[in-house]
Amino acid sequence: MTIREITDKILEYHPKFDASYDGCDGFKSGNPDDECTGIVSALVPTVEVIKKAAALGCNLLYVHEPSYYSTPDYPDWRAGFENKIYEEKKALLDQYGIAVWRDHDHTHAHNPDGIFTGVIKYLGWEQYRVNADTEGMTMYFEFPDMTVEKMNALLKEKMCLNGIRYIGNPKDKLKKVAMVGHLLPNIFEHQPTTGDGFCKEYATEVIRIMEEEDVDAIIPGETIDWTVMSYIRDAVQLGKVKAAFNVGHFNLEELGMKYAADWIPEVIGNAVPVHYV
């Protein structure tokens, strides 16, 4: 089975996109018509991951995040200066004959979300989710016996982290926790303030659920300090039970690519070996 036939099978598994789709998904290196020798699922095609894929005898890297340091994730370097790191990385991929294929938009469009299904599975939180039948980027969990320090320890263990930046009183009990989207300036909203004078940015919606839906703690991806994180810091200093666990974008979604190595073999009929790195 060729690399292109493998990726076509994965696209058939995902919801169909309009033919005009011109997003970040697709090939970033390699020859799609080469025979596939094996697949490595990884969040990011780092130099270390590339070398591990080669050692495993795999020539297809199935990834979720950018290869070459830009948001559009072009397969070439588009700037007015030379990027020697890009050149060396590209040469390494060419040397090993590895194709990089990115699946970001399609897997997030999956229902349920292809990344966060894996995150929830490998955290062991399926039984705690309380809005499993609803769509949207916010997922709620209710725990019978959870504290800030227990959550911190659990996330470190399950995500294989040395430490987590968090806000909260370690002994506070957490009942309702929300896994939320990225907390960046004006993200998900092109016009954060409308005619009624209210702020409509996503961060304000996260504050609303903490105020009105009894959410005690959040686990976001990307963060900035001046919106929700500042709100939570002030809440804690006022003696309220609020917390945030800033695990980081890549750390949060890593388990989703571990999950991909579970479902890809079935989708491709076990045609080639599939590894998670």
Model-derived segments and spans:
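Hydrophobic structural segments
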Residues: 1-277
